[in-house]
């Protein structure tokens, strides 16, 4: 299934290569490779495969999950769709505090609730782990994370391990 998703990402032009003018990721890293997983939302056949695979990963690796939390902004639609497939509630974490009472978590999250974070892409895992920290600070039990794509960077793997978070 992963090979089918990888091929699908290439087919829809989500994975871009440019060795002459590298992409600058949100982390500041310059890379000749960029994956725009938002494009899966406009490719229904691939979107269905991606969301079903994410749902399968949640069921297999995090069977005790009670709620899915998407990362802003690209993880939000995937969390919503996977939540629909699994009949689970979903919410998301804002990247910055909202003006109204500084609220960062949208949706109802109860202390002690078992959470799976839904992310579109992981490089250094910095933004993903910021979401994990917000959730833990709110009393959630973060079981782990699922993502569409990871660059498999050592820094990201090390950051996830240091935070005690598994990504599948």
Where on the chain are the PLM-derived regions?
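PRPP/pyrophosphate-binding module of the type I phosphoribosyltransferase fold
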Residues: 93, 97-168
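Conserved PRPP/pyrophosphate-binding segment of the phosphoribosyltransferase/PRPP-pathway fold
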Residues: 45-106
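Gly/Ser/Thr-rich beta-alpha loop segments that engage phosphate groups in nucleotides
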Residues: 30, 72, 77, 109, ...
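Active-site-facing substrate-recognition patch
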Residues: 1-61
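Electropositive phosphate-/nucleotide-binding environments in soluble metabolic enzymes
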Residues: 3, 44, 48, 52, ...
């Amino acid at each position: 299934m992963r090979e089918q998703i990888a091929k699908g990402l290439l087919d829809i032009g989500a994975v871009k290569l440019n060795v002459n003018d590298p992409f600058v990721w949100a982390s500041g890293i310059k890379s000749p490779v960029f994956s725009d997983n938002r494009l899966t939302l406009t490719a229904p056949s691939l979107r269905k495969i991606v969301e079903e695979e994410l749902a399968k990963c949640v069921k297999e690796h995090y069977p005790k999950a009670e709620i899915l939390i998407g990362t802003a902004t690209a993880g939000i639609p995937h969390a919503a769709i996977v939540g629909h497939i699994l009949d689970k509630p979903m919410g998301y974490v804002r990247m910055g505090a909202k003006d109204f009472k500084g609220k960062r978590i949208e949706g109802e999250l109860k202390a002690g609730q078992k959470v799976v974070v839904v992310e579109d892409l992981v490089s250094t895992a910095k933004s993903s782990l910021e979401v994990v920290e917000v959730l833990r600070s709110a009393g959630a039990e973060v079981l782990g994370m699922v993502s569409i794509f990871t660059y498999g960077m050592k820094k990201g793997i090390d950051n996830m391990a240091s935070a005690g978070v598994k990504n599948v």
